[in-house]
Amino acid sequence: MIQSPQTDPPDGSAPHAVGNEPAPAGHTTRATPPDPHDERPDPRFGVLGQLSVHGRTMSVTSPVRRAVLTACLLRYGRPIGIAEFSEILWDDPPVSATANLRSHVTGLRRDLDEVEPGLGDRMRTYRGAQCGYGLEIAPDEFDLPRFTAAVQRGRNWLLSGSHKSAVDALEQAVGLWNGPFGQDLPPTRWFNAHIAGLNNARLDAYQDLFTASVLAGRTIMLAYRIESVIAEAPYRQHLWELLAAVHCLHGDTVSTLSVVNRCQKLFAEDLGLDLPPGIEAMRKAALNWDREEAMRLVASRTQESAERCQCRRPPRPSS
């Protein structure tokens, strides 16, 4: 689960917001994970794919302003200091970085007000030991905490053998995305780390969803969905295993062997690797018309895959 760090700076003195209402002395902001089962409106802010506000793609012409808002969302719950913000936006900050940042924050407030009057007031200026900027937002107004909660819920169901419940939770998780994360963001070290982490988390969620779908017997159109994700991440071995398994479970030996051959050629030509053992095992199952073995192979990977993904969660809104 994503946990929001508190706003207290390392020296113990609390920053205070400068805006419509100053934060009280000693004020801290803690994020509580949203209840995954309540009926809530769509998140106000979205970063899972294209940056969006109220479900609409954010019409911010300046890529730096989009980066400012994205950084504040990823670090929701505490301000970002001026010096750190400069390092986030530029690997080699210009001399005018502070002035540029101030100008972009002012412009971003106007952009937010155009989407929703008064929304720009959420962008706060902080004074004191942690002089900087931050976005006042509750975790249930933001799509990333919802995604993290749904993925964790789905993995728990998957590990417990409740495959249909796992499918439902993981469908909810992947449904929050509208494309890969990181579009139009500056290619700085900070953003590149978050881009890699979040996009891997998205692919992990799809992989778990496809695994749960196979085990739940929900395989209609599943091969098509797996193919679309393989097109994005062609070197994920488990996706190829799942695709071969779906065809094998449908009794389509020709399609199963075609998948195996495509995988073998790709791994050999691009990576210099032999056919992975899991794919070879699926080929044998198809040749033997052994659907039970194909299902057993998928089930045997469930624990291993889920436990691996437990250690590779979306990056915390910090660092």
Question: Which ranges hold each PLM region?
Answer:
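Short aromatic/basic micro-patch
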Residues: V47, P79, E141
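DNA-binding patch around the recognition helix
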Residues: P34-F45, V105-A138, A268-L275
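Extreme N-terminal targeting and regulatory segments of eukaryotic proteins
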Residues: A25, A31-H37, A71, I82, ...
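Short boundary/linker motifs that mark transitions into or out of structured domains
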Residues: M1-R66, R124-G132, P314-S319
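Intrinsically disordered, charged and Pro/Gly-enriched terminal/linker segments
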Residues: L74, P94-T98, T125, C131-S319
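Short amphipathic alpha-helical recognition elements used for nucleic-acid or partner binding
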Residues: M58-L89, L108, H238-E241
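DNA-binding alpha-helical recognition surfaces that contact promoter or target DNA
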Residues: E87, S103, R110, S258, ...
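DNA-recognition element of transcription regulators
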Residues: T61-T70, P94-E116
